[in-house]
From Swiss-Prot:
Residue ranges crossing the lipid bilayer per the database entry: none
Upper classification of the organism: Eukaryota, Viridiplantae, Chlorophyta, core chlorophytes, Chlorophyceae
Cited InterPro entries: SF_assemblin/giardin_b
Name of the molecule in the record: SF-assemblin
UniProt similarity note: Belongs to the SF-assemblin family.
Compartments where found: Cytoplasm, Cytoskeleton
GO molecular function, one term: structural constituent of cytoskeleton
Organism: Chlamydomonas moewusii (Chlamydomonas eugametos)
Annotated coiled-coil segments of the chain: 98-144
Domain observations: Consists of a small non-helical N-terminal domain and a rod domain with a 29 residue repeat pattern based on four heptads followed by a skip residue. This alpha-helical protein is characterized by the ability to form a special segmented coiled coil and to assemble into striated fibers of 2 nm protofilaments.
This protein's UniProt keywords: Coiled coil, Cytoplasm, Cytoskeleton, Microtubule
Length: 269
């Protein structure tokens, strides 16, 4: 028996061919036909089984992919919702922080405005007080000058009328003048103490108002200190003017006293 190239030889196939050879050509053909039919049937069954297995694996793969896609979509939705919630939370925190910052800024501006208004009012009051004091001192000086002129005239008339009476009147006038001078000096010292106390209180209030400010208020502090320096300079100038006026008054009193003494000497002689 000959074997075709490319086919494997098996004892079963050899025994089958031996039986077919002994049975005759017709039986051989039938047997071969049956074997081919059986082989074809087996191939078809195997093909169907493979298709079913592949279909089952494909279905399982499709279901796994579908589950994975659904899980991925659910995870994406969950993360999107989480991101939205987180973004909403952060936006709310940012808004709250902005509102708190705005409220603190408004409160700071209001407190600063109140401090500035209070300082401005105090400065205006101090300027008004200085002006009133200057007017009062001018009136007092004019009144004192008028009184001195009247007293001088009275003394001159008294000298013309009667020598003894004039001496007595001059002594009384000198006594009154000394009392007036002491009174004026006491008033000047008292007013100086009051103004120094008010200036010290104003300086304390300014330092207290400017003590708790941040760096952004440094310019305002410097400006306020400059104004206070200018005010102190003005007060110092006013004090010097007042001292000069007091010196003029004292000089006038000394001149008047000297004139009275000279007049008394002339009368005595």
């Amino acid at each position: 028996m000959s074997i075709s190239p490319g086919r494997s030889f098996s004892p079963m196939r050899a025994s089958g061919l031996t039986g077919i050879t002994s049975a005759g050509p017709t039986a051989k053909l039938e047997h071969v036909s049956e074997r081919f039919a059986s082989l074809w049937t087996d191939l078809e069954h195997e093909k169907q089984n493979r298709k079913l297995a592949e279909s089952s694996r494909f279905q399982l793969f499709t279901e796994a992919v579908s589950r994975l896609e659904k899980g991925l979509e659910a995870e994406v939705k969950r993360r999107a919702e989480s991101d939205k919630q987180l973004q909403s939370h952060f936006e709310g925190e940012i808004r709250a922080l902005a509102e708190r910052s705005a409220a603190q800024h408004v409160d700071m501006q209001n407190s600063l405005k109140q401090a500035v208004d209070s300082l401005s009012n105090r400065l205006q009051d101090l300027h008004s007080l200085v002006r009133e004091e200057r007017e009062q001192r001018r009136n007092d000086i004019e009144h004192l000058a008028t009184s001195l002129v009247g007293k001088v005239n009275e003394c001159v008339q008294a000298l013309d009328e009667e020598r003894n009476s004039r001496l007595q009147d001059q002594s009384l006038s000198l006594k009154r003048f000394g009392e007036d001078l002491i009174t004026i000096q006491q008033r000047v010292d008292q007013e100086k103490l009051v103004r120094d106390a008010e200036l010290s209180g104003l300086r304390s209030e300014v330092h207290e108002a400017l003590g708790n400010r941040n760096l952004a208020d440094e310019q305002f502090r410097n400006m306020t200190l400059d104004e206070l320096t200018a005010l102190k300079g003005a007060l110092a100038l006013e004090r010097e003017e007042r001292i000069a006026e007091d010196d003029e008054i004292v000089q006038a009193i000394n001149d008047y006293t000297k004139a009275l003494q000279e007049g008394l000497k002339l009368v005595s002689t």
